[in-house]
Regions:
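Short, extreme N-terminal segment that most often corresponds to the first beta-strand
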Residues: 1-38, 116-125, 137-141
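Charge-rich, solvent-exposed alpha-helical interaction surfaces
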Residues: 21-25, 29, 38, 42, ...
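Charged interaction segments
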Residues: 50-141
């Protein structure tokens, strides 16, 4: 059943992740299969300690049209509304989460990682929030 879902994630576009390590690991575990057909399933099967959809503390392929990896910080079912906001990480956050992102790319550039909080109706694709946005709620009144 569809409902509103709220997530707070650390998001990076797949184009900024060197997928060589991930793809080689999948090829070793599934040598005769076309993993491109269902990339998410192969990720979750080959890396069960790292990837699992909608699981706090794990990566997921974002439920968006554009290809992102999300590291899930918070996930809540039966949330309210549709919104999204994003910002760049500050230096201390980039340092804190670097070891986690190095699990998917040892040479990851944390400058491409964004903190994204969004809520959407999960009967549809989630919006592609990534670029820094300013929430008008914080504008001076």
């Amino acid at each position: 059943m569809s409902t509103y879902v709220r997530e707070k994630v650390l998001r990076i576009p797949m184009e900024h992740v060197d997928l060589t390590y991930i793809k080689n690991s999948i090829k070793q575990k599934f040598p005769d299969e076309d993993y491109e057909y269902d990339f998410t399933w192969y990720l979750e099967t080959a890396f069960p300690d790292v990837f699992d959809y909608a699981t706090v503390g794990k990566f997921q392929v974002a439920p968006t049209e554009e290809p992102f990896f999300d590291y899930v910080l918070e996930h809540e079912w039966d949330a309210d509304g549709e919104y999204g906001r994003t910002r760049a990480l500050i230096r201390i956050e980039r340092e804190k989460y670097l070891p986690i992102f190095q699990q998917i790319d040892p040479n990851i550039n944390m400058d491409y990682v964004r903190l994204v909080e969004f809520c959407w109706y999960n009967g549809t694709e989630a919006p592609d929030y990534y670029d820094d946005t300013k929430d008008p709620f914080y504008d001076e009144v």
